[in-house]
A protein has these predicted regions:
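Extracellular/periplasmic envelope-modification machinery, especially enzymes
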Residues: 1-11, 15-330
Length: 330
């Protein structure tokens, strides 16, 4: 269509601009046509750009009107409670090393004498923790996580030795006698586990050691299986034509593919958790998947911001599922 318009305008340019110029007659109509041609050209560029989709996560968030979590520099977002905890534990956060920038910490209290939720793990735990922190009216919450770093009591494990900064902070938190609930979650599926360990047995041993220690604690422990991970960016699901926004109908993760991606991981969790019944296992699969597919959008709003991080809407759905397992939640 744009090509046809351009050909037609080219004829008009020849007929009413070039011929007018040669005849040295009025240039008013010629100027109008020139402006129209430039406008149409720019319009064509805009249409073509829309057909190519969205260019960034920021575009993705703005076009679909949802909040986008920012991980760029958590250090800039420390609140007064977090800073007070650092001072209390005599931890220096001001050196701003890369390790510390990747430490995701949030709190709505610095008083360890209060009844506490602790949420620990990697960036997945951090985003879930923000939702718990905002909604739990009974207990205060402290979120302590490190990007790409699972929770562990034992740094001698062969599985993912993690940053000393976050482990030092967590060891001090875990000494509090007023912990009432501990939530643990992290990125995990068959591919990521194998990529990190080269051997599933290493992860299985890590999980067994972790559950063994947690089963002896005097607070409730919730281990949350990771949400489905996508095989594509959700940004690719959006089609735009000027102001018309559509989600591709084929934009979902096939359930059988998801089950295949997590078969070994879930089998290990099931096997080990059977030995430690005190630990509550929460599988959020039913929240996002039916027997055919796992959804990525709900009423035109994305549940995922990228391949493995949920949007605030997605986290809210996950949190509502977790609440069902907590008897005393207010």
């Amino acid at each position: 269509m744009v090509l046809i318009i351009c050909v037609f305008l080219a004829f008009l340019v020849y007929r009413f601009i070039e011929l007018y110029a040669r005849a040295q007659k009025s240039y008013v109509f010629a100027l109008i046509l020139l402006v129209a041609m430039i406008f149409t050209g720019l319009l064509g560029i805009a249409i073509q750009k829309d057909k190519l989709g969205l260019n960034s996560k920021r575009d993705f968030a703005q076009v679909l009107n949802f909040e986008l979590f920012a991980l760029a520099d958590p250090l800039k977002h420390d609140d007064i409670h977090t800073k007070t905890l650092f001072e209390k534990f005599n931890i220096n956060r001001n050196s701003a090393t890369n390790e510390q920038r990747m430490s995701l910490i949030k709190a709505n209290t610095a008083d360890l004498n209060e009844n506490l939720n602790l949420i620990m793990g990697d960036s997945h735990a951090y985003f879930l923790g923000i939702e718990i922190l905002k909604n739990d009216k009974k207990f205060k919450s402290i979120v302590s996580a490190a990007s790409t770093c699972p929770f562990s009591f034992d740094e001698n494990t062969d599985y993912r030795k993690c940053r000393a900064f976050i482990r030092d902070f967590e060891s001090k938190l875990l000494s509090s006698p007023n912990i009432k609930r501990l939530f643990i979650t992290a990125l995990a599926n068959d591919a990521t586990i194998l990529g990190q360990t080269k051997n599933y047995k290493i992860y299985e041993q890590y999980l067994d050691d972790l559950f063994k220690i947690l089963s002896n604690k005097n607070y409730a422990v919730y281990f949350i299986i990771d949400t489905p991970n996508l095989t594509f960016e959700p940004i690719s699901c959006v089609q735009r034509y000027l102001n018309d926004i559509k989600i591709k109908p084929t934009c979902f993760l096939a359930r059988d593919l998801y089950d295949e991606q997590t078969k070994i991981y879930k089998k290990m969790v099931k096997k080990i958790s059977a030995k430690y019944p005190k630990i509550t296992i929460i599988d959020p699969t039913p929240v996002f998947c039916d027997d055919k597919k796992c959804v990525i959008f709900e009423n035109g709003k994305p549940l995922y911001g990228d391949t493995n991080h949920l949007t605030p809407l997605g986290e809210k759905k996950l949190f509502n599922e977790i609440k069902k397992y907590i008897k005393d939640f207010e």
